[in-house]
Amino acid sequence: MARLYLIRHGKPSATWGGNDDDPGLDETGQAQARAARDWLMALPAAERPTRVVSSPLRRCRETAEPTAQALGVDIEVDARVGEIPTPAALSLAERGPWLRKSFAGTWAEIEGDLDYDAWRREIAASLIGRGNTAVFSHYVATNAVVSELLGVPQVLAFRPDHASITVLETDGVTLTLVEKGREATTGVL
């Protein structure tokens, strides 16, 4: 079995409703990215990641950068581990209320342009072949994977904190949850 690490991005410099729809990390987020790197690099060699994958969004790429540099590898950008797709008809101002409503329900109940239950299965399936990999992603995408692996329909399986590291194992055929990452004490929205 190979280890896979699903890391939520560090604290961004802006939140929902701000002027920047793709913010980078603030100083706290940069420190969190370095702490994630240090944790990953302290693992035994057999468990340490050899690849780095990131969501296309800047906050994830910036969180991934210290780990990629320490490993001497390039960041592989993969949209499949990106942010939950917002329905096309929603404005930026409507996204927060849509997310809050989505968080309160199940994957099958999310209203939008696609089958969000299928979306969560696709994210988990995309990770099966990624052993020995650090994957830098988002709050909702991390919940998609965890809820799929636990077999629960709720959107919120847990509340991953910024730069928390969820540990998974894969044999190339199946994906297993080893340990959820550190949980946040504050809300996302």
Regions from the PLM with identified roles:
Residues 29-33, 116-119, 135:
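Conserved anionic group-binding/transfer micro-motifs
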Residues 4, 50, 129-140:
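Generic beta-sheet signal
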Residues 66, 144, 148:
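Active-site signature of alpha/beta-hydrolase-fold catalytic machinery across serine-
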Residues 2-77, 105-109:
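Active-site-proximal alpha-helix that buttresses catalytic centers in soluble enzyme cores
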Residues 1, 73-77, 83-97, 129, ...:
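Acidic, low-complexity terminal tails and accessory targeting/binding regions
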Residues 34-41, 120-128:
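Generic structural signal for well-ordered alpha-helical scaffold segments
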Residues 12, 141-142:
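Short active-site segment of divalent metal-dependent hydrolases/proteases
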Residues 97-118:
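Short glycine/proline- and acidic residue-enriched helix-loop micro-motifs
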